[in-house]
Amino acid sequence: MNTLSSKVSEILSELVMLKSTAEDDIKPIVDYVSAKLTRLGLQPRYHNEKGRPAIIAQSGDAGVLLSGHLDTVPHGADWDYEEAETVTGKMYGRGTCDMKGGCTAMLVAAEELVAIDVPFSLCFTTDEETGMKGAEAAAKDRAMKAAPAVLVAEPTNFDIVVREKGLLQLSLRTSGVSAHASMPNLGENAITKMTAILCKLEDLTKVPRDPLANLTMCVDMIRGGTQINVIPSTCEVDIDIRYPAIMSSESVLALLKKRIGKSGYELKILHQLDPVETDPELPAVRTLKEVLGSGAKTITVPYATEMVMFKGHGNAMMVCGAGDPKVCHANDEHIGVSDVARAAKVYVEYCTKMAARTR
């Protein structure tokens, strides 16, 4: 194993062993990253300190900002590999791909960028999986505002994400009247009312021929009833909707209300994120394609990253990193150590080229 791969393997394994789910104490991993940054001569700044903090470190002025999140989803059961176990060049463990691999690449790249005196900034958040409040706070930092490009180091197999679909998560509730199931005429069944509403939305739940370019809708949770012999007085479903940039959350809600009418239910927005779109012909995007070499392509993804929280400053925003998104949150999550090393090299070259072009 060469020196770069050894460095990657050491940092990634240490990050993986520092547990960072929503239930874990986040301080150990924040302290670990802060110490790494301080040893490079950087001075970490903290945002959202009363919650799950975001760390920003800056070297020089107006450099590319690299961003990643240190938190993970829970581990889960039935894994075939131990945490941070490496087999045939792949390291296994929760967070290896999503996205401590990307954070490792950022830290390794930072060491080289400091050595060659290229301006850059880093942002590490700790609540991407549970709300993105840290990213929202970090978006106000001066490094974010000055960056010519923001590059989120999430796993993309080194494709360049320039578009993300919007997210709208809703709670839909119907009410009825409770009664003994032997006398349904005395009650009003909330589940039956919900069934009628969902039938009006059924065609929206069918997967379109091109899911990336169209709205998709999933009914993912349902709650109703208390006992088999009691007419249910309430029924509630949670709905997840992803929509393309040509739509807005307002137009999606209007579409739903047109289908199901304006009464007979309660509708509540649980969470929403706007779609994000970056012009693939921007110089900052073309420069990244240059660095990645032949075969590099820009893509659209159906999910959201913290890129959505960073928009609004006029800088180019992209997602690009090592690892396969399909293994994120899965059992036996893993990432190639050599891929993380390649990502570090890509980030160094990209920051260097962007610095030369913006001087």
Predicted regions and their residues:
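Acidic-glycine-rich active-site phosphate/pyrophosphate-binding loop
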Residues: 71-87, 146-147, 162-173, 318
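A structural signal for isolated positions on well-ordered beta-strands in alpha/beta enzyme cores
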Residues: 45, 65, 121-123, 266
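Acidic/His- and Gly-rich active-site-bordering loop/insert found
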Residues: 1-94, 116
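Residue-level signal for inorganic ion chemistry
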Residues: 15, 19, 37, 154, ...
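Metal-dependent amide/peptide-bond hydrolase catalytic core
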Residues: 3, 45-48, 155, 162, ...
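Phosphate-handling active-site elements
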Residues: 87-89, 109-122, 146, 201-210, ...
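Glycine/serine-rich anion-binding loops at beta->alpha junctions
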Residues: 90-105, 180
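Acidic/histidine-rich catalytic neighborhood of metal-dependent amide-processing enzymes
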Residues: 100-169, 209
